[in-house]
């Protein structure tokens, strides 16, 4: 379980349902399988510290759960829901490794 605060409430979220997380204007948005998107005031680095090894940072603004990795292209990847996310140049090989 992942415990976090969102809009003044302490919430818990099953880690296996997290598809990806995005940082936008210093706010963390966590997209899930079944819960929609939830919001928290947390850094992406702090979020990643609490996640298991199958979560990787693919870009300055994104962390993905590799269990939901559906496809890899040049400097982008597709996760569940056909969401296309950017991949940093230096992370391309890492993402491809998890896809294989």
Residue locations for each model-derived region?
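Basic, polyanion-interacting recognition surfaces, primarily
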Residues: 1-100
């Amino acid at each position: 379980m992942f415990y976090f605060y969102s809009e003044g409430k302490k919430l818990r979220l099953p880690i296996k349902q997290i598809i990806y997380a995005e940082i936008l204007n210093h706010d963390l948005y966590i997209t899930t399988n079944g819960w929609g998107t939830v919001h928290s005031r947390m850094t992406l680095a702090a979020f990643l510290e609490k996640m298991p090894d199958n979560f990787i940072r693919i870009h300055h603004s994104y962390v993905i759960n590799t269990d939901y990795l559906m496809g890899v292209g040049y400097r982008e990847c597709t996760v569940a829901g056909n969401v296309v996310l950017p991949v940093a140049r230096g992370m391309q090989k890492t993402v491809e490794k998890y896809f294989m």
